[in-house]
Amino acid sequence: MDGMTGDFRFGVNMVVPDSRAAWVEKCRKAEDLGYDVLSAADHLGMAPPFPALVLAGEVTSRVKLNTFVLNTPFYNPVLLARDVTGTDQFTDGRLELGLGAGYVKEEFEAAGMPFPSARERVDHLERTITELKRLYADPEHKPAPVRAGGPPLLLAGRGDRSLTLAAAHADIIGFTGTAKTPDGAAPAPASAEEIEERVEFVRAKLGGREAEFNLLCHFVNITDDRAGALAELAKLTRGVLSADQLAEVPTALIGSPAAVAEQLHAHRERFGLTYYTVLEHNMDQFAPVLEHLR
């Protein structure tokens, strides 16, 4: 699944705006900047991901189109299969399906749905994967997926069961790479050792099966003052990790474009990470890094 940047792929997790024109402009810009994947999140209060991705497919020619990630408990698996394969058809096979177990209790309440336990949410995710595979393989199911077996599947998670499920079924395994600050007020990077432990857990479960490793990078700062930026991030994240520890974590891509490119190569060697997703507000400042990897 190599992209324009050779051994790596880079995606942007987009916020879908209120107007069609603004969304079209954003999508074209992401592709022009050299990103490989354009992602739409799935949260109440935001535009629905499937129509957004169909429109993105109409106004771009190269980027893959990804749901990052669906709140799977909101979906009936049979109805979801229809939306997935229909979107796959309308985007000429550029869809990547990202699924998660769901975690925002307030969204379930807003939808008038009970908030299931973690076990129940992962149970539903597993049932959904099984049902999607069954329907993809059914020659009577319409619309049919563009490729046999359906679009590439991304499963994201942090816990043992979610990552075991990902190791068994996913083409792309998404690592969250975050922890909570002591007061719970802000996301903070998990330590390099914590991420490495999760990666090794997945590798053991894969048993030699190939899968692409994805990481959502919350912390991007393209700057010539790396030491200062790391010190500032340590303060912002309430000292969960020191500046020296932050210098090693793959979720904090900080430094000049050339320095960040070197970090990405080092993280690939240590963690096997080859597919990174940045948040939309970092899309412009991260783009020069792509130039160093072409």
What residues fall within each predicted segment?
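Active-site-adjacent structural elements that line small-molecule/cofactor binding pockets in enzymes
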Residues: M1-R294
